[in-house]
């Protein structure tokens, strides 16, 4: 139950002043709350008989909006002052805070972030309904079990006019002509939102009441807490309630607990336990004890210990109230008379009258205490609220950019709209091809991803050379036996050399095609993601672009694969320029001789094919040639295969995708079909625009708030 007061004219209590109504200043400082001694707050005397131009407590003449936390029940004396001065102080200090939050709530900002509020929670039969009734002056639905099943935002406005009401939920707005309609309409709204069972819902019901007989305030009533789920009630109903509002840091929790339960063990106080879960330090929880008239004799001191914060500690302390009981309601006891009886009860009670002296008892003092707490809480929350609004506004703006502008209705405008869409898409494809796209910190550019695949190709080529070396003796011996003719020992059989070269080059075809496949998948997925980024909200256009990307990819893949296979067919020719091969051969032979400790220092040893090879077997000589040729071939393939892949799968692929996109513009009859949006895109765009509008209005409201600016 969120509570906020506005300046009103109420009838004042005829009872003379007593020592039980001490003076109190209202402070709003962000310092830890004082010790939970009695804080006295003047009651908004709306349930009384004689005419008075304002219910405002006298202490409002000393209002101070410095953001200091109010003391947790520190007893003070009331001050007196002219009523017009009280009203002016209220207008200047209190009302702007309440009106600010009400205006944000009216804008619907609570859909986007939590607003400062006071929530009332309580177990079944805790007296929560009676407390709400006494605070608001409006009778809400009553009964056994959970009666409040949806949060109820109750905005009461005092005005000298006939009683009027309005209830709003979802897309339903119902005007009310009589107070007797309120209960039935609330029940009806709850059934529509939460079903006819006992389930609860987080959806808000808004009830506005305008009447000369109600206080100016705002309430948010939360569902009550049950210990065991009944009938078709969900088993996690307690968690559902906790998830509604009370876990928000912006909410002050007002926990209603009967005096006749064991608070020390919390055995029968689920509401208090739940509040402790979401607020373990008790920084934003106030305890409200009810039904003090039902306390058994001899247990009064236990209640006093609770009120003194000695049993279950809350930083904001406790207050105690006595509301109308069922018999009082049956006897149609007025709220004004109930207030007088409550005051008389505490004044005459041998144990509890000290609580009245300390300002911890009666409903009017509770109402003032809540006003104090809420105003302080609002001022404390404003800086955080401003930051949250800025962040959510920025995120909503960025999200809206993804959905783009509204589709124009004019056919000519649709052409320009589509041209712009395709232009931006083609620009992004161009950046991908050139390696100039913008990427996140943890991502890599497309060209770099492909280059990483090319690095693995180098490892494959190196591994192939090492494989030839490792099986050289076995392979050459096998081919020597098969192909050697009349050559003398030491002469190289070219057929043996050529056969080994062709065999091991042939083993590189599959790895090259696999590298092509991986590179193709990387490019294809990147192009698809880019298309989704630009066209996801246009189902037909998106599918058309995806199909074109797929078709072009398939054709480019086939061309690249054919060219790679052609490259390896040409490699079977076993060719290398003499000048290049001679240099490589000398280098390999030199390395082998050095490793064998037989390197020659004579100038002739450096001339190709002129060395005395009589002491070298044909196997060693073929090994020299194989190493030399594979080294040169690997250099050629290390660049040539990546060249083919880059050209067909990146450069030419991207160019063809860009041209295919431009061809879409030639089919003018299909513009409307191509620009047909997803079913929920327009809804999402509208939702985001409304959200941005709400948050913009909220920013303006905060900027214009005088205390926030000052």
Curated annotation (Swiss-Prot):
Keywords: Antiviral defense, Cytoplasm, GTP-binding, Immunity, Innate immunity, Nucleotide-binding, Nucleus. One of its GO terms (cellular component) is plasma membrane. Residues 619-710 form the GED domain. It comes from Bubalus bubalis. The keyword Heme does not apply. GTP binds at residues 122-129, 221-225, 290-293. Residues 290-293 are annotated as: G4 motif. Residues 147-149 are annotated as: G2 motif. Its main location: cytoplasm. Residues 112-383 form the Dynamin-type G domain. This is Interferon-induced GTP-binding protein Mx2. Residues 122-129 are annotated as: G1 motif. Pfam families: Dynamin_M, Dynamin_N, GED. It is found in: Cytoplasm; Nucleus. Residues 322-325 are annotated as: G5 motif. The gene is MX2.
């Amino acid at each position: 139950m969120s509570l906020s007061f506005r300046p009103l004219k109420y009838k004042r209590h005829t009872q003379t002043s007593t020592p039980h109504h001490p003076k109190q200043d209202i402070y709003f400082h962000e310092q830890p709350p004082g010790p939970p001694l009695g804080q006295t707050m003047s009651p908004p005397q709306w349930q009384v008989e004689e005419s008075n131009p304002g219910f405002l407590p006298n202490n409002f003449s000393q209002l101070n909006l410095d953001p200091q936390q109010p003391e947790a029940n520190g007893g003070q004396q009331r001050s007196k002052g002219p009523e017009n001065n009280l009203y002016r102080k209220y207008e200047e200090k209190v009302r702007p805070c309440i009106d600010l939050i009400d205006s944000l709530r009216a804008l619907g900002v609570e859909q986007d972030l939590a607003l400062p509020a006071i929530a009332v929670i309580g177990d079944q039969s805790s007296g929560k309904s009676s407390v709400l009734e006494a605070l608001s002056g409006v009778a809400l639905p009553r009964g056994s079990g959970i009666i409040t099943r949806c949060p109820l935002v109750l905005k009461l406005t005092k005005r000298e006019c006939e009683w009027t009401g309005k209830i709003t939920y979802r897309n339903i707005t119902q005007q009310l002509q009589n107070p007797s309609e309120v209960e039935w309409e609330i029940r009806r709204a709850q059934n529509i939102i939460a079903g006819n069972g006992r389930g609860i819902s987080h959806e808000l019901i808004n009830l506005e009441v305008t009447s000369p007989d109600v206080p100016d305030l705002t309430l948010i009533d939360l569902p009550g807490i049950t210990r065991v789920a009944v009938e078709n009630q969900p088993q996690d109903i307690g968690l559902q309630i906790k998830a509604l509002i009370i876990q928000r840091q912006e909410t002050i929790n007002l926990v209603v607990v009967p005096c006749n339960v064991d608070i020390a063990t919390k055995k029968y106080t689920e509401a208090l336990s739940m509040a402790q879960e979401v607020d373990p330090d008790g920084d934003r929880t106030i305890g409200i004890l009810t039904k003090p008239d039902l306390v058994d004799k001899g247990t009064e001191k236990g209640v006093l210990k609770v009120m003194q914060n000695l049993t279950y500690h809350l930083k904001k302390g406790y207050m105690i109230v006595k509301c109308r009981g069922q018999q009082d309601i049956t006897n149609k006891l007025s709220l004004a008379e109930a207030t007088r009886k409550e005051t008389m009860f505490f004044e005459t009670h041998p144990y509890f009258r000290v609580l009245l002296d300390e300002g911890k008892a009666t409903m009017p003092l509770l109402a003032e205490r809540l006003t104090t707490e809420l105003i302080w809480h609002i001022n404390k929350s404003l800086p955080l609220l401003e930051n949250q609004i800025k962040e959510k506004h920025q995120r909503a703006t960025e999200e809206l950019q993804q959905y783009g502008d509204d589709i124009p209705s004019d056919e000519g405008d649709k052409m320009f709209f589509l041209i712009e869409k395709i232009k931006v898409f083609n620009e992004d494809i161009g950046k991908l091809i050139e390696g100039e796209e913008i990427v996140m910190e943890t991502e890599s550019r497309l060209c770099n991803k492909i280059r990483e695949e090319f690095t693995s190709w180098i490892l494959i080529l190196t591994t192939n050379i090492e494989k030839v070396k490792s099986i050289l003796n076995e392979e050459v011996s096998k081919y020597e036996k098969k192909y050697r003719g009349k050559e003398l020992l030491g002469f190289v059989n070219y057929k043996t050399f050529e056969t080994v070269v062709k065999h091991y080059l042939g083993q590189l075809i599959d790895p090259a095609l696999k590298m092509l496949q991986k590179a193709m998948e990387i490019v294809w997925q990147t192009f698809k993601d880019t298309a989704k980024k630009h066209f996801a909200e246009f189902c037909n256009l998106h599918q058309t672009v995806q199909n074109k990307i797929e078709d072009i990819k398939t054709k480019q893949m086939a061309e690249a694969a054919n060219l790679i296979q052609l490259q390896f067919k040409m490699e079977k020719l076993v060719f290398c320029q003499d000048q290049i091969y001679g240099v490589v051969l000398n280098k390999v032979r030199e390395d082998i001789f050095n490793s064998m400790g037989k390197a020659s220092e004579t100038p002739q040893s450096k001339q190709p094919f002129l060395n005395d090879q009589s002491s070298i077997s044909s196997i060693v000589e073929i090994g020299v040639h194989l190493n030399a040729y594979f080294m040169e071939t690997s250099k050629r393939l290390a660049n040539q295969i990546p060249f083919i892949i880059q050209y067909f799968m990146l450069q030419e692929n991207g160019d063809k995708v860009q041209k295919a996109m431009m061809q879409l513009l030639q089919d003018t009859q299909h513009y409307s079909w191509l620009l047909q949006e997803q079913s929920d895109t327009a809804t999402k765009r509208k939702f985001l625009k409304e959200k941005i509008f709400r948050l913009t209005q909220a920013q303006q409201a905060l900027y214009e708030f005088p205390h926030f600016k000052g």
